[in-house]
């Protein structure tokens, strides 16, 4: 699997627990690789969903 977990916006992806991608914009991605999450957001691994056109996500807002 692509370690960068790249996919189209609003697409689906299955990021591994060790995923460290920074460009993942998948709505289905529930790992800390959501690009809208700040580094060190402890809640991101608990179900982060990036909001469209936003620099924050549902768990880090």
Swiss-Prot record:
Residues bearing PTM N-acetylmethionine: 1
Region (Beta): 1-29
PANTHER family named among the record's database cross-references: METALLOTHIONEIN, METALLOTHIONEIN-1G
Chloroplast is among the record's keywords: no
A single GO molecular function term of this UniProt record: metal ion binding
Residues binding a divalent metal cation 5, per UniProt: 34, 36-37, 50
Entry-linked Pfam families: Metallothio (PF00131)
Modified residue annotations for Phosphoserine: 58
GO CC aspect terms: cytoplasm; nucleus
Annotated residues for binding of a divalent metal cation 7: 50, 57, 59-60
Residues at which a divalent metal cation 3 binds: 15, 19, 24, 29
Gene3D superfamilies listed in its UniProt record: Metallothionein Isoform II
Residues where a divalent metal cation 4 binds: 33-34, 44, 48
Residue ranges of the region described as Alpha: 30-61
Residues that hold a divalent metal cation 1 according to the record: 5, 7, 21, 24
Amino-acid positions noted as binding a divalent metal cation 2 in the UniProt annotation, renumbered to this chain: 7, 13, 15, 26
Coiled-coil ranges from the UniProt annotation: none
Protein name: Metallothionein-2
Superkingdom per UniProt: Eukaryota
Note on domains (UniProt): Class I metallothioneins contain 2 metal-binding domains: four divalent ions are chelated within cluster A of the alpha domain and are coordinated via cysteinyl thiolate bridges to 11 cysteine ligands. Cluster B, the corresponding region within the beta domain, can ligate three divalent ions to 9 cysteines.
GO biological process per UniProt: cellular response to cadmium ion; cellular response to copper ion; cellular response to zinc ion; detoxification of copper ion; intracellular zinc ion homeostasis; negative regulation of growth
């Amino acid at each position: 699997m692509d370690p960068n977990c790249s996919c189209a916006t609003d697409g689906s992806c299955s990021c591994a627990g060790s995923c460290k991608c920074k460009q993942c914009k998948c709505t289905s991605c529930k790992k800390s690789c959501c690009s809208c999450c700040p580094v060190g957001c402890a809640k991101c691994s608990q179900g982060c969903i990036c909001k469209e056109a936003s620099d924050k996500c549902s768990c880090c807002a």
